[in-house]
Amino acid sequence: MNNNVEELLRRIPLYNKYGKDFPQETVTRFQMPEFKLPALQPTRDLLCPWYEECDNITKVCQLHDSSNKKFDQWYKEQYLSKKPPGIVGNTLLSPSRKDNS
C-alpha cells in the first residue's frame, strides 16, 4: 500500500508556485498594517457595573419577598380577623347541646 502512494507521488510533476526563477528572485515582503489593542481598563472599573447589577437584583428580590409579607398582613387584617376562631385556628368546632330543662 505504501509503495503505491510513493509511485503515485513520483508521477506528479513538481513545480514551484513562485515560478522557475524563484531561488534567484527575491519575493516581495508582505506589509501588514500595524494594529494596536486598546489599553486595558482597571479591574475595578470593569467589575463595577456587575456589582451594581447584582445589588439591584438583590434589592428587587428583597422587595418581592416583602410584598408577600405585606399581603399576608393585609389578608390577616381584612379577612381572617372577621372569621370565627375555630376556622382560623384549625380547631374542631362541635355543636353544643341545648339543655331543655
UniProtKB/Swiss-Prot annotation:
Subcellular location as annotated: Cytoplasm; Endosome; Late endosome membrane
Keyword Protein transport listed: yes
GO biological process, one term: endosome transport via multivesicular body sorting pathway
Pfam families, A to Z: Mvb12
Residues the record lists as Phosphoserine modifications: S94
Gene3D superfamilies: 6.10.250.1830
Keywords from the UniProt entry: Acetylation, Cytoplasm, Endosome, Membrane, Phosphoprotein, Protein transport, Transport
GO cellular component terms listed in the entry, alphabetical order: cytosol; endosome; ESCRT I complex; late endosome membrane
N-acetylmethionine PTM sites in chain numbering: M1
InterPro entries: Mvb12 (IPR019014)
Effect of L47D: Defective in MVB12 incorporation in ESCRT-I complex; reduces localization to MVBs; abolishes interaction with STP22 and SRN2
Membrane topology value: Peripheral membrane protein
Domain of life: Eukaryota
One MF term in the entry's GO annotations: ubiquitin binding
Keyword Cytoplasm among UniProt keywords: yes
Note: Present with 752 molecules/cell in log phase SD medium.
Subunit structure and binding partners: Component of the ESCRT-I complex (endosomal sorting complex required for transport I) which consists of STP22, VPS28, SRN2 and MVB12 in a 1:1:1:1 stoichiometry. Interacts with STP22 and SRN2.
Function as written in the Swiss-Prot or TrEMBL entry: Component of the ESCRT-I complex, a regulator of vesicular trafficking process. Binds to ubiquitinated cargo proteins and is required for the sorting of endocytic ubiquitinated cargos into multivesicular bodies (MVBs). Appears to be involved in cargo sorting and release of the ESCRT-I complex from the MVBs.
Identification of the protein by name: Multivesicular body sorting factor 12
Taxonomic source organism: Saccharomyces cerevisiae (strain ATCC 204508 / S288c) (Baker's yeast)
Gene that this polypeptide is encoded by: MVB12
